[in-house]
Amino acid sequence: RYALAILAIVYMFNFIDRQILAILLPAIREEFGVSDAWLGFLTGTAFAMFYIILGIPVARYADRHNRRNLIALAVAVWSGMTALSGMAANFVQLALARIGVGVGEAGCSPPAHSMIADLYPPEKRSTAMGVYTIGISAGIMLAYLLGGWVAQNVGWREALLVVGLP
């Protein structure tokens, strides 16, 4: 149960860092003067392209190596890249940092699913996966609540730093 709770919390942070950008887009548009198309690239393509490309190789790596360590590395990468997003001096730097978030987050789900499959017998696995995926909704909720509040009261950069540094 402890491992499952940790995995769900990790998944929650995964989605906080993934989704927070959505609520910050108006401030980013204002600062960098970019179009909706570029904001779409930032929130979609920049992240998803590398997440998709790396998903299978990361899963294969997880099959042969220590999954716990892979998840820890993934958390460090995506959290660091989220924090770097808040330090971007221009739109290109922000896009590169978001690509880094996608690279890091690609290392979460494959090893987590594999660990859950090993920890729970088939008759309990669906419940375990349900607990794990609570992290999705909790992360989205917290991204909007925390991100919106911090952005409104301090700034969009600080919102990314707050969620990226824990």
Identify the residue ranges that each predicted region occupies.
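Small-residue-rich transmembrane alpha-helices and their cytosolic helix-loop interfaces
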Residues: Y11, G44, A48, V75, ...
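Residue-level signature of mid-helix packing/kink "hotspots" within the transmembrane helices
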Residues: Q19, A48-I56, A106, I140-M141
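Extracellular/periplasmic helix-loop-helix junction of adjacent transmembrane segments
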Residues: L24-I53
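Interfacial helix-cap and linker-helix signal at transmembrane-aqueous boundaries
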Residues: I28-R29, Y61-A62, L146-V154
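Helix-breaking motifs and short loop linkers at transmembrane-helix boundaries and internal kinks
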Residues: G33, N66, M87-Q93, G104, ...
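Conserved MFS/SLC helix-loop-helix module at the cytosolic interface between two early adjacent transmembrane helices
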Residues: I53-A89
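Cytoplasmic helix-loop-helix junction between adjacent transmembrane helices
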Residues: A97-S137
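Symmetry-related core transmembrane helices of the 12-TM Major Facilitator Superfamily/SLC fold
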Residues: E158-P166
